[in-house]
Amino acid sequence: MTDQQLDYQVTVEELSALMKRTAGVHVDPVTLRQQADDGFDTFGLDSLGLLGIVAELEKRYGLGLPEQAERCKTPADFLALVNGALKTGV
């Protein structure tokens, strides 16, 4: 992993694209941003879909994300946890 990757932040737009690509759930990024504190289930994403997103990010960055990432209930919580892990390399 490079220093550039450590500074990288997963955006709402990227999360929206990952939801579509890995779980087949289409959510407009604007809606996702406006409702970031709503549960993933509100958008039709279940725990297996979230697991797919976690796996994709781990593969992309070569970094094991914290186990809590798979249990995040909202997009806001997920992005905060993932971006914190990317920043610290944990």
Swiss-Prot record:
- Pfam families in UniProt: PP-binding
Keywords, A to Z, come to: Phosphopantetheine, Phosphoprotein
The free-text function statement in the UniProt record for this protein reads:
Involved in developmentally regulated synthesis of a compound biosynthetically related to polyketide antibiotics which is essential for spore color in Streptomyces coelicolor.
Q: Which residues carry this modification: O-(pantetheine 4'-phosphoryl)serine?
A: 47
Modified how: 4'-phosphopantetheine is transferred from CoA to a specific serine of the apo-ACP-like protein.
List the protein's name.
Probable acyl carrier protein
* Domain of life the protein comes from: Bacteria
**Domain (Carrier) ranges:** 9-90
